[in-house]
Amino acid sequence: YKRKGEYGRQYIIPIGRLDLLCEDSQGNLYVVELKKDSGYDDAYKQTAEYLDWFEKDKRFKGKKVYGIICLNSPTQQLIDKVHADKRMRLFEYQISYTEL
């Protein structure tokens, strides 16, 4: 997302600091939260609060806003919460290292 020369990471809004704010060619916004490991059940609440803020802010009126949470080993509770919210998607990443 670009704002007067700023784009990419750490987009700041009054209620917090987004890891990434992205915009597609149709003007839809994507709040991306990146978590370094598991144990982030509050990631849903945090992302939902960000989405609610964008939906209420007049500067973003008419834009669709979605949340994307990326983390390693999400709990079933987090999976269930995200699947129940049509605004959000959940991605799990895995890292492996191989000695060469």
Where are these regions (language model features)?
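Charged, terminal alpha-helix-loop-beta segments
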Residues: 1-100
